[in-house]
Amino acid sequence: MTTWDKCLKKIKKNLSTFEYKTWIKPIHVEQNSNLFTVYCNNEYFKKHIKSKYGNLILSTIQECHGNDLIIEYSNKKFSGEKITEVITAGPQANFFSTTSVEIKDESEDTKVVQEPKISNKSNSKDFSSSQELFGFDEAMLITAKEDEEYSFGLPLKEKYVFDSFVVGDANKIARAAAMQVSINPGKLHNPLFIYGGSGLGKTHLMQAIGNHAREVNPNAKIIYTNSEQFIKDYVNSIRLQDQDEFQRVYRSADILLIDDIQFIAGKEGTAQEFFHTFNALYENGKQIILTSDKYPNEIEGLEERLVSRFGYGLTVSVDMPDLETRIAILLKKAHDLGQKLPNETAAFIAENVRTNVRELEGALNRVLTTSKFNHKDPTIEVAQACLRDVIKIQEKKVKIDNIQKVVADFYRIRVKDLTSNQRSRNIARPRQIAMSLARELTSHSLPEIGNAFGGRDHTTVMHAVKAITKLRQSNTSISDDYELLLDKISR
């Protein structure tokens, strides 16, 4: 076992697993008598190792080898030259440091030695200068495997196509816009910004755009990625000193699709690179599609210049599908799996799973798997049994009068206002919301709901549902109110 191997065991005990794997494990240390050369991957990595972990490395090597030693920090990838920083350690090494810079080429060796000086800076501070360049999370993503190969973006999944996307009032505008940009990229809706909660189909739509655009134009250069991968690509290009290639690849795309763009907020280096990438693509008429869990203005920490550019094109929402759409999703999913699902079972699952499409499909898979394993048909009874620990099946179903009370309390009006003939906006809008909630949360027919709201016609209920669905796509305040009420009533 080498001296450095012994040191690694001791260092590992003093660091988190993440720090050890990210910063210490990748470096290579070569020993030649009393000279220890710490090989780092580039200038940034060398500076970070030396400033953040220099004291720990020095004291650990002293413990395993003795005080009489020299530590040399080397940047192997410095173009045309090898830059080293040498620390000579003696009995006072913890308090004094002698630093020299050695620049080597074929003709001469030059060494300049500075006088020893007391350092007032602590190497144990939490944030190095790298964070000023990239932001903490970006810096911590950098690894130092010099021979590691990397590529840009992520593959598109063939299963995500428009034909498998179930359309309803909550997503039809987003779906129509997605189809348009896949046929005529860069012509309309640039950028296309799709926002909505997790598991509602944003990624499906985004990848469907890429897959369909590739069918329309097989020669189109399509890059799909998410913000996490974009950050990794960016910091890897810095680590490998290959930023030109990163920029060449991303800025030469005909269609750029980035999922969960909200995660670049607060990542200064990545946000700046994305800003320039956006500008380059937009000015060249290339299509940009972005998704987020929030409306652009609501993404905390997102630079104003990016918020402004996201507004250049079309912003559309994908909301939780209504009951009918949820049933349609379940029936289609079962059909795609080659399974028969009774309509009443689909309705039962749809009524009780209202969080997102992903959990809806997960519940379906559980019901189908359980029924198949037990050699039973997927009846409501089977669904009740196997989903008991997944969904809270209320002993009493949601009633319209409860919906009316919750909505009235929320908007500080009276229940009788909701059933009255008043048409003022402060009454009419809550009434429409209450009708829409009743349609989604109960099994009552349109005439029954209309009757509960002062004997109104079923067409009035239909109009209310359509109006609120449309408003939820364009008005974040209405959308937020609706989701909050949905949560209150469903508890």
Curated annotation (Swiss-Prot):
The keyword Cytoplasm applies. One of its GO terms (molecular function) is ATP binding. Keywords: ATP-binding, Cytoplasm, DNA replication, DNA-binding, Lipid-binding, Nucleotide-binding. Residues 372-491 are annotated as: Domain IV, binds dsDNA. Residues 69-154 are annotated as: Domain II. Residues 1-69 are annotated as: Domain I, interacts with DnaA modulators. GO terms for cellular component: cytoplasm; plasma membrane. ATP binds at residues 199, 201-203. PROSITE patterns: DNAA. Its main location: cytoplasm. Residues 155-371 are annotated as: Domain III, AAA+ region. It holds the Pfam family Bac_DnaA_C. Belongs to the DnaA family. Plays an essential role in the initiation and regulation of chromosomal replication. ATP-DnaA binds to the origin of replication (oriC) to initiate formation of the DNA replication initiation complex once per cell cycle. Binds the DnaA box (a 9 base pair repeat at the origin) and separates the double-stranded (ds)DNA. Forms a right-handed helical filament on oriC DNA; dsDNA binds to the exterior of the filament while single-stranded (ss)DNA is stabiized in the filament's interior. PANTHER family: CHROMOSOMAL REPLICATION INITIATOR PROTEIN DNAA. Domain I is involved in oligomerization and binding regulators, domain II is flexibile and of varying length in different bacteria, domain III forms the AAA+ region, while domain IV binds dsDNA. Oligomerizes as a right-handed, spiral filament on DNA at oriC. This is Chromosomal replication initiator protein DnaA. It comes from Francisella tularensis subsp. holarctica (strain OSU18).
